[in-house]
Each structure stands twice: as structure tokens, then as C-alpha cells.
């Protein structure tokens, strides 16, 4: 029988989970991080410290549309696992495998290649400004006479 974590293929599936399932998912995610980092190395404590907030963010936002900008990539292992990279997480740090930091080349969910502290604020501001510049312009046909 698949674990709850193994049944998650897309982060939007988390939005349908109840509190008990979210708690179980966080625990399974935590165990996965411990399992892999004990063999492959990596950032254990910082990643374990962000499991619950990662689950909460994925429950409440749609990162196909919304953007998350992690300040430091070594806090994002749960995010990597829950955004479609669980099956490949065993390759953490290997050549051609999952990177230990966020990488826009690795996943469309990695919106910023975080690596160092205190870069998220300026990156998020830049993204916000760019989204403001890209206006959505509706081309209205004959519906204007009915409004």
C-alpha cells in the first residue's frame, strides 16, 4: 500500500487533504528527508524545520500561479519532495540528480535559484514588479453593450 507521500504526484493534490492527512504527510516527509540525508548528506536540521510551513504553503497557495521565493535553498527539501521530486529524491547531491539547492532548471516550481541568505526579499520584489509590468488586456467583443 502506498504511503500518503507516495500518492502525491502534484502539489495541488495537497489542497484536498484534511488536517489529519496533512499531519501524516508532514511526518512522512520528515522521515523521507531523514532517510535520504542520512545516506547522501545534505541539510537536515534546516529542512526539518520547514516541513510544516511547506505543507501549509502548498495547502493554501497554487504555485502553478503563485510564486514562492525561498531565502535559502537548504530549507526547501520538503518543497522539492512535495513538488513532484519525491521519487528522485534518493539522487540528492549526485551528478545529474536532485540538487541540494533550488534550481529553475530542475523544476518549474523552483521560481528562484536560492542559495544564500537574504536574497528572497529583493527577488520577490523584482518578481512582483515584473508581474505588474505584464498587464492582462481583455479584448472585449460585443459584450460591452450588455454591461
Task: Identify the residue ranges that each predicted region occupies.
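Cofactor-/ligand-binding subdomain signature composed of acidic, glycine-rich
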Residues: 1-36
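Glycine- and acidic
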Residues: 10-13, 34-42, 106-113
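Compositionally biased, intrinsically disordered low-complexity segments
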Residues: 17, 36-37, 56, 140
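Cofactor-binding active-site loop characterized by glycine-rich and histidine/acidic residues
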Residues: 43-147
Amino acid at each position: 500500500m502506498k504511503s500518503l507521500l507516495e500518492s502525491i504526484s502534484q502539489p495541488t493534490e495537497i489542497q484536498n487533504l484534511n488536517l489529519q492527512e496533512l499531519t501524516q504527510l508532514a511526518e512522512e516527509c520528515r522521515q523521507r528527508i531523514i532517510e535520504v540525508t542520512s545516506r547522501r548528506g545534505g541539510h537536515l536540521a534546516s529542512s526539518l524545520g520547514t516541513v510544516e510551513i511547506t505543507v501549509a504553503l502548498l495547502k493554501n497557495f497554487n504555485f502553478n500561479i503563485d510564486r514562492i521565493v525561498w531565502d535559502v535553498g537548504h530549507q526547501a527539501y520538503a518543497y522539492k519532495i512535495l513538488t513532484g521530486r519525491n521519487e528522485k529524491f534518493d539522487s540528492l547531491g549526485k551528478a545529474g540528480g536532485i540538487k541540494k539547492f533550488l534550481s529553475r532548471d530542475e523544476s518549474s516550481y523552483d521560481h528562484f535559484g536560492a542559495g544564500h541568505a537574504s536574497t528572497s526579499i529583493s527577488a520577490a520584489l523584482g518578481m512582483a514588479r515584473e508581474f505588474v509590468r505584464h498587464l492582462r488586456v481583455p479584448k472585449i467583443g460585443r459584450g460591452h453593450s450588455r454591461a
